[in-house]
Amino acid sequence: MKVLLLQQPKSFSNYPKWIEEIQERFDCLEVMVFTSNDRAAHHSWPSSVIKEIEVSDYSSDSATAKFFDIVRKFKPDRIVSSSEEDVLRVAEARSLFGIPGLQHELALSCRDKVTMKQSALDAGLKIIPYTTCQGFGDIISAFDRWETVVLKPRWGAGSAGITILHSKDDLPALATKPEFIRNVHSNQYYLEEYCSGSVYHVDVVYINSGSILISPSRYLVPPLDFEKQNTGSVMLDENGADYSELLRLTKQLIASFNDQTIPNVMHIEFYKNETGDFVFGEMAARRGGGLIKQELAAAYGIDQSKANFLLELGLVDADANITRSS
C-alpha cells in the first residue's frame, strides 16, 4: 500500500509510532510525508517512510499545487490528514484521482459554512437564520432582521475571525480595514443572527454504520470567548434528555449523507435556544480542539487522531470500544 501522509506544522501526532505498529500488516507499505519546514515536531521516521517532502508555506496555493503534483506522480492508495486546512484539498485530490476516503462534495459541506447550513437543512435540522454577505449593504440590511449580527468567515476554523456586531455604528471602524473590505467584497463572509443559548459539541468517531462513537458535551464557556477565557466542557449524562436528543440529531445528520464516505472523525456544534430546542451550528471533518481529544481518550480509550489514521487505512475493527468508561 502507498500512503501519502500530510502532517500540518502544529501537529504533534505520533505518526512514526503508529506506522511502526501497523507496517507489518501490509506486504509492502510505502509512506510519503508532506509537511512544512517550520513544523513543531521533527520525527525520525521508520523504514517504510520513503520520503519526507517539505514546503515553506504549508497553507499556500503553491503548497497545494505541490501536493497535487505529488499525488499525480506518487499515485497513493490512501491519503491521510487530520487538519482542517487539508480537508478540502485532500478530498479534491481523492475525487480527482479516484482515491478512497472523504470526497469533495461532503468535504465542501464540512468547510464552506453556507453549503454546510444547507446540508443541515436538507437533513431536517433546525439552523440559525443566516444570509450571504457580498458587501456592506448586506450587513446593513441584516440589522433590519436581527438585533445583533454575527459576521463569520465562510471558510474559517473554530471561532477565529468571527465578529459580533451590536449595531450599524460598528461598521465605520471596520470599513477602514483594507483586509476586511477585501474579504467582504470577495464573498469570504456570511451573516447570521446572534444566538445567545448554551453551546454544545458532539464528537464522533465513525467506524461503520453499526459502530459510531458519539459523545455530546456542553461548553462551560462559549467558544466565541476563547480569547478571553479558558474554554472547557463537560460530557453529558448518558441518561439525560439532552444527551439522547443530541445523539438522535447527530445520527440524523450522518444518515443524510447517504452513500457518501463519512468522515472518520467529526466535530459538530449545536446551540440550545431559549425554547429548549437544539439548533445546528457547524460541523467539521476533524477532531475538536482544546482538550476534547484528551477527554475522549480518558472516557473511551480512543485517540481520535490515531483512530483517523487507522480508519483511513482500513485497520480499525468493528468491535472497537465506543462505550464510555465509568
What are these regions (language model features)?
Residues 1-105, 315-318:
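ATP-binding N-terminal substructure of ATP-dependent carboxylate-amine bond-forming enzymes
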Residues 4-5, 122, 139, 307-326:
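Peripheral (often C-terminal) accessory segments that flank ATP-dependent C-N-forming ligase machineries
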Residues 51-59, 130-135, 163-165:
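Short acidic-hydrophobic, aromatic-tinged amphipathic segments that line or gate anion-handling sites
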Residues 94-161:
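A conserved helix-loop-beta module that forms one wall/lid of the active-site cleft
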Residues 120, 143-164, 183-197, 202, ...:
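ATP-grasp fold ATP-binding core
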Residues 126-130, 148-151, 164-197, 201, ...:
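Conserved ATP-binding module of the ATP-grasp superfamily
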Residues 193-199, 203-261, 272, 280, ...:
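ATP-dependent carboxylate/phosphate-activation module, predominantly the ATP-grasp catalytic core
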